[in-house]
Regions:
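Generic secondary-structure signature for well-ordered alpha-helical cores
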Residues: 55-63, 114-115, 166-170, 188
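Structural beta-sheet core signal
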Residues: 9, 33-35, 78, 123, ...
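ATP-dependent adenylation/pyrophosphate-handling site
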Residues: 2-53, 186
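Active-site adenylate/phosphate-handling loop in enzymes that bind or generate adenylated species
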Residues: 85-86, 91-168, 220
Length: 223
């Protein structure tokens, strides 16, 4: 029996994640998209861009569109995380803010994955592009999910990713200011200290509690 390929996709509203989704659709994966919303810290633009890109896949008349209509879920899970992220703006943990953010996202992806029967977590991460995506931090991030990681863009140059987005039609939909760093530090750490991360999360109420509290306010957007 061929194992069904099911993943949870963390879709941010930026340029990279729709490209990652498209690559995995072409590889035959069934995809359940998740968007972690930072409203009201930010505006609704990130969610709007996420919805626009996913609907584009479902509507285009092309081989990619055919794959999306077959394997991309028409339900986008939106999870508000602003309250949880604001806890990591204190002086004692702010330099690790982006790592805590991605760890939280992985924990939420894990929760959705359990419900959907997924085996993998898909991200648009690109090695070294930002602080949370250094080799020193990726391990500390992915340990918060039992799902295996799919990072199809990890070693691809950013300019190549932009060209890929342009060629498939999502680049314009994803343009706009990056909002994930709204509360982020000016000098983020590039090498995580796991013991300190865990102590900071415990001080903020405990990692599992942060995940559960964020999940209480999740909603479903029909694509």
């Amino acid at each position: 029996m061929v194992e069904q390929k099911v993943c949870i996709a963390l879709v941010s509203g930026g340029i990279d994640s729709p490209v990652a989704v498209a690559r995995m659709l072409r590889e035959g994966w069934s995809i359940h998209p998740v968007h972690c919303s930072q409203e009201p810290i930010t505006g609704p633009e990130a969610e709007q861009k996420t919805i626009a890109a996913l609907r584009y896949f479902l509507e285009i008349e092309s081989p990619l569109g055919d794959l999306a209509r077959q394997n991309l879920s028409r339900e986008l899970t939106v999870i508000p995380v602003a309250q949880q992220l604001s806890l990591f703006t204190e002086k004692w943990c702010h330099t690790e803010y982006f790592i805590h953010m991605k760890r939280l996202y992985c924990g939420l992806g894990d929760l959705v994955g359990t419900q959907k029967g997924a085996t993998h977590l898909l991200t648009g991460e690109n090695l070294g592009q930002v602080s949370s995506q250094t080799l020193g931090n990726l391990g500390a991030i992915e340990m918060m999910t039992s799902l295996r990681m799919l990072r199809p863009l990890l070693g691809i140059d950013k300019t190549v990713i932009m060209h890929m987005a342009q060629s498939m039609g999502t680049y314009e939909l994803s343009l706009g200011p990056e909002v994930c760093d709204a509360l982020g530090p000016s000098l983020p750490t590039t090498v995580a200290n796991l013991e300190w991360l865990e102590k900071s999360e415990e001080r903020a109420g405990g990692f599992q509690n942060l995940v559960e509290e964020a999940w209480k306010n999740h909603r479903i957007v029909q694509l």
